[in-house]
């Protein structure tokens, strides 16, 4: 194969084509001879941004950058347009194909996989108090929290959930990063932006949530509030 252009068999729009390479259906930009890495990862049930956060991936990108190889680039567009949706994403030179292919073929779940969650209540969030923990089943964990507190108001809700291959390790790492803000146990008094910053360089992926701030309730004294909610 001289280039990715040789594998193209169907035009999507403009310079974008479908191609078949080693049993993988790719979206190819004929102008650059690069493939859509985002779509390739999606086809394997994973997200490209997770791959970019791996240490091995960072070293690989640095290696090709030092060699002066073609760099990755992003194509954006209105995803309401079906044809545009098929072409948006990050494009990468063929040099990256094998590594990304091996990664998406790894088992998605392991005994250590799960999520690290950040939850709060409308009362706690007024004082920037958040609970950070890990679980394999967030819905069940949240239900357990709120069933235990069935007579108390308000209920816990999620402000951030991170998918990861090693949930316990990630939780421990985040707790260490935020140790100066620890209030009690898994509770931290710190701005949400600081918590999210702590996750940025870790091997995890933020899940999409519908979250709106609610400051309708407050307590004057934080310690009284925590005692009232049986936190301390």
Swiss-Prot record:
Q: Which domain of life is it from?
A: Viruses
Record-annotated KilA-N domain positions: 15-119
Offer one Pfam family short name for this entry.
KilA-N
Q: What is this protein called?
A: Putative KilA-N domain-containing protein 315L
Tell me the organism's taxonomic lineage.
Viruses, Varidnaviria, Bamfordvirae, Nucleocytoviricota, Megaviricetes
């Amino acid at each position: 194969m001289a280039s990715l252009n040789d594998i193209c068999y169907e035009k999507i729009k403009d310079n974008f084509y479908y191609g078949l390479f080693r049993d993988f259906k790719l979206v190819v930009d004929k102008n650059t001879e690069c493939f859509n890495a985002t779509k390739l990862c999606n086809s394997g049930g994973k997200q490209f941004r997770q791959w970019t956060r791996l240490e091995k991936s960072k070293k690989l990108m640095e290696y090709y950058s030092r060699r002066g190889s073609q760099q990755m680039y992003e194509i954006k567009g209105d995803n309401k347009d079906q044809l545009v949706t098929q072409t948006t994403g990050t494009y990468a030179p063929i040099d990256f194909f094998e590594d990304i292919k091996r990664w998406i073929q790894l088992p998605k779940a392991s005994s250590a996989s799960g999520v690290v969650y950040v939850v709060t209540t409308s009362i706690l969030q007024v004082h920037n108090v958040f609970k950070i923990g890990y679980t394999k089943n967030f819905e069940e964990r949240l239900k357990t929290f709120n069933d235990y507190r069935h007579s108390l108001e308000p209920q816990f809700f999620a402000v951030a959930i991170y998918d990861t291959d090693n949930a316990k390790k990630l939780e421990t790492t985040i707790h260490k990063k935020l140790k100066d803000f620890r209030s009690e146990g898994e509770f931290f008094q710190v701005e949400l932006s600081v918590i999210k910053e702590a996750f940025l360089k870790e091997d995890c992926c933020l899940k999409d949530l519908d979250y709106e701030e609610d400051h309708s309730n407050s307590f004057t004294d934080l310690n009284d509030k925590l005692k009232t909610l049986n936190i301390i």
